[in-house]
């Protein structure tokens, strides 16, 4: 798995062309109206839909007010620096409502549930599940066959660029609403209890709980049974 350097991300954001994409439903005498070079138009007769940058489409609307009867604008961002990840070629299960930004790496057979938010530079390993409303901040790295519970937060580190990102090693279970602070590494096979706040590294094959989180025991057979990762949920 590849970890994106913080300065690469900062440079990407700085130099990216900021975008305010819109979808406009429009009605009027639309023939011959130029909505800008980047616009895509789907017009039949006197009605249509236009996709493009608001700056260009707004200028066209204002220049042709006498021809346009009505319009409605759909808009969900302003001067956005980072597009969303193109999901069509990802070999993973990604449910509606997940927000995944560009330059995120998602391993095969991963599962991203509704409402999860994954920021630029994050890595999700093969067979890992990111549950509902979990947040992976910038550059957070999760290994293979993990489960990041609902509402859990893995802190992001893009600024300052020298900060060490969160690293979750393979076969880790992070409980619901747990928080892993920047710079923390959670060792292979560990379990982080629900609601824990993890401020220091977690040794492999241990269970941590509490605020701040402390090791409460080593992984035993009972814990393994309660935290089993089901591959059936990861099949495509």
UniProtKB/Swiss-Prot annotation:
Gene3D superfamilies: Hexapeptide repeat proteins, Malonyl-CoA ACP transacylase, ACP-binding. Disulfide bonds: none annotated. Pathway: Amino-acid biosynthesis; L-lysine biosynthesis via DAP pathway; LL-2,6-diaminopimelate from (S)-tetrahydrodipicolinate (acetylase route): step 1/3. Keywords: Acyltransferase, Amino-acid biosynthesis, Diaminopimelate biosynthesis, Lysine biosynthesis, Repeat, Transferase. InterPro entries: DapH, DapH_N, Hexapep, Hexapep_transf_CS, Trans_hexapeptide_repeat, Trimer_LpxA-like_sf. GO terms for biological process: diaminopimelate biosynthetic process; lysine biosynthetic process via diaminopimelate. It catalyses: (S)-2,3,4,5-tetrahydrodipicolinate + acetyl-CoA + H2O = L-2-acetamido-6-oxoheptanedioate + CoA. The keyword Cytoplasm does not apply. Its EC number is 2.3.1.89. It holds the Pfam family DapH_N. PROSITE patterns: HEXAPEP_TRANSFERASES (PS00101). One of its GO terms (molecular function) is tetrahydrodipicolinate N-acetyltransferase activity. Belongs to the transferase hexapeptide repeat family. DapH subfamily. Catalyzes the transfer of an acetyl group from acetyl-CoA to tetrahydrodipicolinate. This is 2,3,4,5-tetrahydropyridine-2,6-dicarboxylate N-acetyltransferase.
